[in-house]
Design a protein with these regions (language model features):
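Bacterial N-terminal signal peptides
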Residues: 9-16
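Bacterial N-terminal signal peptides that target proteins for export
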Residues: 1-8
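A beta-rich soluble binding module of mature secreted/lumenal proteins
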Residues: 16-174
Length: 174
C-alpha cells in the first residue's frame, strides 16, 4: 500500500514537471529560426544571478549538432572566486518545429529547463534568451561586446516582457 501511495504521489508531480511550458506566458520565440546559423560560439554579455553561474566571468556557450538532431551545449566560464575554469555539457531539443526557437535544455538527466530565443538579429550575431519563467534571461553575442543600440533594444524588449532588467549582471570578458 505504501508503494502504491508513493507511486500515486509521484505521477502528478512528474506530469507537472514535464508538462510545464518552456516559455513565459505572453512571450513568443523567434520563428523562421535557422538552427545551422545559430550553432557555434556565443559570448554571454548579461544574465541574471543564477547559482550555477555565480562568480563566473568570460562566460561562453558553444552549440553543435548531435547526430540525433539534438544540440550539444557546452557552457564555460572562469570562476573569479576559485580562479578555475568551470564547464558544463548538456543537450538541447526543440519543443516544437525546428523553425521555432523554443527549446528545452538539460545538464542533468531527464530534467529540462526552457531555452527560448526571443530576439535575434538577421545575421545571428546577437540574441536575447528567456528561460521558462521571468527569472532566467541572457543576452548573447558572437563577440565579447554588443553595440549600444542592440543593448538598448534588447533591454526594452525584456522589460516590456516583464523581466526585471535592473537585476542583470554584465559579464566581464578579459
Amino acid at each position: 500500500m505504501k508503494n502504491l501511495t508513493s507511486f500515486i504521489t509521484i505521477i502528478p508531480i512528474s506530469i507537472m514537471l514535464f508538462s510545464c511550458s518552456t516559455i513565459p506566458k505572453g512571450i513568443n520565440a523567434v520563428t523562421q529560426f535557422d538552427k545551422a546559423k545559430y550553432l557555434g560560439k556565443w559570448y554571454e554579455i548579461a544574465r541574471f544571478d543564477f547559482r550555477f553561474e555565480r562568480d563566473l566571468n568570460n562566460t561562453t556557450a558553444e552549440y553543435s549538432a548531435n547526430d540525433n538532431g539534438s544540440i550539444k551545449v557546452v557552457n564555460k566560464g572562469y570562476n573569479t572566486r576559485t580562479n578555475k575554469w568551470k564547464s558544463a555539457t548538456g543537450k538541447a531539443k526543440f519543443v516544437k518545429d525546428e523553425t521555432i526557437a523554443m527549446l528545452k535544455v538539460s545538464f542533468f538527466g531527464p530534467f529540462y529547463g526552457g531555452y527560448n530565443v526571443i530576439a535575434l538579429d538577421k545575421d545571428y550575431r546577437y540574441a536575447l534568451i528567456a528561460g521558462n519563467n521571468l527569472n532566467y534571461l541572457w543576452i548573447l553575442s558572437r563577440t565579447t561586446t554588443i553595440p549600444a543600440a542592440v543593448k538598448t533594444e534588447y533591454l526594452q524588449l525584456a522589460q516590456k516582457a516583464g523581466f526585471n532588467i535592473n537585476e542583470l549582471i554584465w559579464v566581464k570578458h578579459d
